[in-house]
């Protein structure tokens, strides 16, 4: 069988262009809102009347709507291209595999109706992102649409200035920091969780891609009348035991399984948790299963190679020891912090808060240096594209 085109690293990189697009939208909206919080007067001289006058001007909704509309249009185009590519590469892979198995090619492996349904579902997920997104404020208790976030900042400043607690300048610093820190979020209506907009975009892409790949895999297995699948493998796989017997993905990755019990290979449902949220092809899982034809297919990794897949990864850094999996999690954590600081820098710059912007710049330089040193120590490539905030 030819090599399956959607390896874990390929799957991990696929959503990044669209995730980056939504980070750019977040940056644009932050700039649009925070730039309108500036007043010409010295902060200590600003009165409540000045703030109310500023509030009456509001934010130009046309600019916000234009930014969202442009992002939606670009994302739909890129999403269609991505899905068409996934379909084409799956079709090519399984056509070659069926030829090697000396079987007659089917007219259609996955019908156009099924593909269109998955495409529409994925497009709907992206429309939901722009329809439900908002900025997280009030210490995470409230999520406001972008246009209302501006009024919230001024209302909060009015209350604080009227009480005599702090000046307008200090109130705006707090509001700007909170807007940037929480960032642009999207509500997951099933779980109620509020994801960052780029995380929601990545998940929408991965769900669509996973559904398409699964359809092709299952249809090919049915056509070839095989109950066997080979599971992909990657370095730094989850190796932490959990509630489920399949929680440690490292234990079962890279091997061959059957959909039947008592077969020559272990059961894929019992060992890998296929179909479970925390199992194979579940939430945040980059592993895929590929059709295995006994006597034709060859394993991608030997057992010995799997035993050494994490060699050279992981490290001891600043007094703490990390496994390969823990190192990838720590790297992601630092990336999220860098993105947060970049949002703050953008917001402070837009609001004309020069001192705060410079302070964030210092933090960014230090954290970038730590990120580079940690990635090198852990043997991990730097994922700079994950930290981009577009300008």
Features from the language model and the residues they span:
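Conserved structured core elements
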Residues: 166-173, 183, 195, 199-211, ...
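N-terminal leader/targeting and assembly helices and adjacent pre-domain segments
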Residues: 1-175, 304-391
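Contiguous, non-catalytic segments that form substrate-binding/exosite surfaces or channel walls
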Residues: 133, 137-229
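A general structural signal for well-ordered secondary-structure junctions
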Residues: 185, 255, 351-354
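Acidic, glycine-rich two-metal-ion catalytic cores of nucleic acid-processing enzymes
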Residues: 195-306
């Amino acid at each position: 069988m030819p090599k399956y085109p959607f390896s874990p690293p390929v799957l991990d990189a696929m959503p990044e262009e669209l995730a980056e697009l939504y980070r750019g939208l977040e940056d644009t909206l932050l700039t649009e809102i925070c730039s309108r919080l500036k007043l010409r007067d010295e902060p200590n001289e600003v009165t409540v009347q000045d703030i109310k006058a500023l509030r009456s001007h509001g934010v130009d909704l046309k600019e916000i709507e234009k930014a969202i509309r442009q992002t939606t249009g670009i994302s739909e185009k890129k999403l269609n291209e991505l899905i068409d590519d996934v379909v084409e590469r799956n079709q090519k892979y399984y056509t070659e595999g069926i030829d090697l198995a000396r079987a007659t090619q089917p007219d259609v492996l996955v019908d156009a109706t099924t593909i269109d349904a998955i495409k529409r579902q994925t497009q709907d997920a992206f429309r939901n992102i722009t329809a439900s997104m908002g900025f997280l404020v009030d210490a995470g208790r409230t999520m406001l649409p972008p246009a209302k976030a501006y009024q919230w900042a001024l209302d909060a400043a009015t209350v604080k200035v009227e009480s005599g607690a702090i000046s307008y300048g200090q109130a705006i610093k707090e509001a700007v920091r909170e807007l940037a820190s929480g960032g642009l979020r999207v509500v997951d209506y099933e779980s109620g969780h509020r994801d960052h907009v780029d995380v929601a975009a990545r998940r929408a892409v991965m769900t669509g891609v996973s559904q398409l790949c699964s359809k092709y895999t299952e249809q090919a297995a049915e056509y070839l009348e095989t109950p066997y699948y080979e599971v992909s493998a990657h370095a730094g796989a989850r190796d932490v035991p959990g509630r489920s017997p399949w929680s440690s993905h490292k234990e079962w990755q890279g091997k061959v399984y059957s959909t039947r019990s008592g077969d020559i290979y272990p059961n894929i449902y019992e060992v890998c948790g296929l179909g479970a949220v925390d199992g194979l092809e579940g939430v945040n899982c980059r592993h895929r299963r590929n059709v295995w034809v006994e006597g034709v297919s060859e394993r991608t990794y030997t057992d010995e190679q799997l035993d050494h897949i994490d060699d050279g990864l992981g490290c001891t850094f600043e007094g703490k020891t990390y496994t390969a999996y823990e190192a990838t999690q720590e790297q992601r954590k630092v990336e999220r912090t860098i993105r947060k600081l970049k949002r703050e820098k953008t917001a402070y710059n837009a609001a004309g808060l020069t001192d705060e912007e410079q302070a964030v710049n210092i933090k960014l330089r230090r954290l970038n240096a730590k990120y580079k040193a940690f990635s090198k120590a852990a043997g991990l490539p730097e994922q700079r594209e994950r930290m981009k905030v577009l300008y």
